[in-house]
Amino acid sequence: MRCFALVMSLVAGATAASAQSFSVPVVYRKLPNGLRVVVSENHAAPVVVVEVMYRIGFRIEPRNRTGFAHLFEHLMFQGSEHVAKFEHVRIVNENGGVLNGSTRFDHTNYFEVMPSNALELAIWLEADRMRSLKITPENLKNQQDVVSEEVRVNVLNQPYGAFEWLGLPQKANTNWYNAHNFYGDLSDLQAATLDDVKQFFETYYAPNNAVLVVTGDATVDEVMKLAEKNFGSIPQRQLPARPD
């Protein structure tokens, strides 16, 4: 019994030490314009991850705007006021980084993994497209076609490929937001006007509808100064009620 108690105490101590060694420091802040900032410092390597998450995904799209969340995942790489078309990708790659974006049920996210000495560059790139995305007739038409083709190839033309996105939600739910076609009705997508798309951007791509997350080799003070400098002047907007 004494041996068993000793073993159990050692296991408990090891477990506690292990849990302590894996604790992750996280700091939450918010700018006056509503942008939430989450920072987790880890100085093990000179690398940072910068991510901006917007509260708009497949499930939150309003009626007659299905497919818009996914459309914007593509439009966000078409240039902004100070960054030409496709330059966002080139700039990140030439500074030793990688990037991507994705659309989920309740959010769309964009991220860069960069050397930590390029932290300000990554934050500036994200702020520039939140502030001044280039929504032009050419960019819209091009990405309408790209997204439509992606849906056809990856979903509609795949055996059972449509089930998760087009079939299951309607069978599992009655609320329209949870039951509609999550990849979007292609007729909604192709009917989108420039004004429709601009209004969607102005509604959902707002600082008070977003979270800036920075993890890695950066301090909280450094991140907050850069967040205020680059995002602080972007005005917050009136947000629609969130669906059930």
Which residues does each predicted region cover?
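Acidic/histidine-enriched segments that form metal/cofactor-coordinating
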Residues: 54, 80-81, 87-200, 229, ...
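Short, surface-exposed beta-strand/loop micro-motifs that present aromatic residues
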Residues: 26-28, 36-41, 198-203
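Envelope-exposed proteins and targeting segments
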Residues: 25-27, 33-35, 46-52, 106-108, ...
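Short beta-strands and strand-coil junctions in structured, solvent-facing domains, enriched
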Residues: 57-62, 132, 220-221
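An aromatic/glycine/proline-enriched structural segment found at the starts
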Residues: 174, 207, 211-244
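Active/ligand-binding-proximal structured segments within catalytic/core domains
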Residues: 34, 43-92
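Boundary at the C-terminal end of the N-terminal hydrophobic targeting segment
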Residues: 16-21
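Bacterial N-terminal signal peptides
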Residues: 4-14
